[in-house]
From Swiss-Prot:
A Pfam family assignment: ZapD
Keyword Cytoplasm part of the UniProt annotation: yes
Main localisation: cytoplasm
Compartments where located: Cytoplasm
Record text on subunit structure and interactions: Interacts with FtsZ.
Family stated for the protein in its record: Belongs to the ZapD family.
Protein name: Cell division protein ZapD
Length: 247
């Protein structure tokens, strides 16, 4: 039984974008295989949202910069006495491999953007009920095709995202592991601290307290206000302990 709930909050725009991309790709895979209209619309809606995120900024450039930054951090750690140099060298090799893979890949989302079925469904998703069979006969026929054929098509779409997912998974994993959780205490539901140039806040709260955080701030300073899930009858303890990692 789950006893704690984890919250993650970005402290800059690049991290906000990366977390959204991670979430959307997870959602794309959540209802696979695509076997009916419900799972199809769930899949295509998240594909469309992902393409919208790609169009708002140069995600690949930001990821390549982060790969370089992580390599520099590993290089500085390699000079610390007693560190596992073999592990550091292995991580640096993985970072270089992902950098090469990402640089060699086509523009992010280009294959998905040019696919006729994805483009047609994406256009209709903004219309309430706009994906009926009379609106999208192509989708209707596709959903009536053998499951094996749809699986091949969906897997080919997902494969075009592999350079991105491999890179993003490693970057987020390194960032999340960069700082341990430490016990903190809020007073009257409020807590603030310096960000120390962190990219990401991670909070673990006891589920039984039925609280959630409202977080504001940036990499230099942040503030957290805890709110009761039940806005009418819930209350926030005068002193509330939680776990916090500034990554």
């Amino acid at each position: 039984m789950q006893t704690h709930v984890l919250f993650e909050h970005p402290l800059n725009e690049k991290m906000r974008t990366w977390l959204r991309i991670e979430f959307l790709i997870q959602q794309m895979k959540a209802l696979l295989p695509v076997s009916d209209h419900a799972s199809a619309l769930h899949f295509f809606r998240n594909v469309g949202d992902l393409l919208d995120v790609f169009e708002r900024g140069d995600t690949r450039t930001e990821l390549l910069k982060e790969l370089e930054r992580q390599q520099r951090k590993l290089q500085s750690w390699a000079e610390v006495p007693g560190v596992d140099n073999e592990r550091i060298e292995s991580l640096r090799h993985e970072l270089k491999a992902r950098s090469s893979m990402l640089m060699a890949a086509p523009r992010l989302g280009q294959t998905l953007r040019e696919d006729r079925l994805i483009a047609l469904v994406r256009q209709r998703l903004s219309i309430p009920g706009g994906c009926c069979s009379f609106d999208l006969p192509l989708l209707h026929v596709w959903l009536c095709s053998p499951q094996e054929e749809r699986d091949v098509q969906v897997n080919s779409w997902l494969a075009t995202l592999q350079p991105l997912t491999y890179t993003l998974d490693m970057i987020l994993d390194l960032i999340r592991q960069s700082a341990p959780f430490r016990k903190q205490t809020s007073l009257n539901g409020f807590y603030q601290d310096n960000g120390d140039d962190a990219d990401l806040l991670r909070l673990q709260l006891p589920l039984q307290e039925a609280l959630y955080p409202q977080i504001s701030g940036h990499k230099s300073r942040f503030a957290i206000r805890f709110m009761p899930l039940d806005s009418e009858h819930g209350r926030v303890p005068e002193r509330f302990d939680f776990e916090l990692a500034c990554c």
